């Protein structure tokens, strides 16, 4: 289910988004959704690195499965703190 929202942003960010949409031949809504999704992933990685989130919580925050999150963390060069429960959760 999708929701519609209205946001305010400064001119610099608006121009940045407009530029991206032109380069990618996309629309503004898609660019915002993509950036939000990327932000979720980066937030999840950061919280996992700091120890503020377990692997399962980080995966949930990023909108990924535990296995996908493990792969993503490896791509970011983040050392895994996988415990037995985390491993079993990913199966």
Regions found by a protein language model. Give the residues of each.
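Short amphipathic alpha-helical segments
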Residues: 7, 17, 24-36
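Short, solvent-exposed charged binding patches
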Residues: 19, 50-91
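DNA-binding alpha-helical recognition surfaces that contact promoter or target DNA
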Residues: 30-34, 46, 60, 71-72
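Short, amphipathic alpha-helical "recognition" segments used to contact nucleic acids or chromatin
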Residues: 40-50
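Short Lys/Arg-rich basic patches
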Residues: 1-9, 80-83
């Amino acid at each position: 289910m999708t929701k519609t929202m209205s946001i305010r942003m400064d001119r610099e960010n608006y121009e940045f988004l407009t530029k991206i949409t032109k380069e990618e031949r996309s629309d503004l809504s898609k660019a915002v959704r993509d950036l939000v999704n990327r932000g979720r992933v980066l937030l999840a990685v950061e919280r996992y690195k700091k120890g503020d989130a377990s692997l399962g919580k980080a995966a949930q925050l990023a909108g990924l499965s535990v296995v996908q999150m493990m792969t993503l963390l490896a791509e970011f060069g983040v050392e895994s703190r996988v415990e037995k429960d985390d491993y079993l959760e990913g199966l």
